[in-house]
Amino acid sequence: MTAITVTYKSDVKMNTDYYFGSHVPMVEDRLSSHGLRSAEVRKIVGTPTGAPAPYQIITTLYFDNVTDFTAAMGSDDGRAVLKDIANFYDGTPDIMIGET
């Protein structure tokens, strides 16, 4: 299983209402036909030490393998998902690929 982790930094302006109300449903709708198995979204509320958290949202997308993820993001649907980021986030999220 391939886990794609997308992090949104705390110090970058983000419209979380749009993210949860529009972007997350769009990702699930558009990428499920391209191999998206599931998605987890975590709103970060703090750290164990009380220090400010470096991220406000961490999202993990699960695909069977990295080939499916690459194909999904290269599709028209994947490009639409990436383009939509500008509608709610003033920066570029960090995207990491992991294996479970």
What is each residue range found by the language model?
Residues 1-100:
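Macromolecular interaction modules
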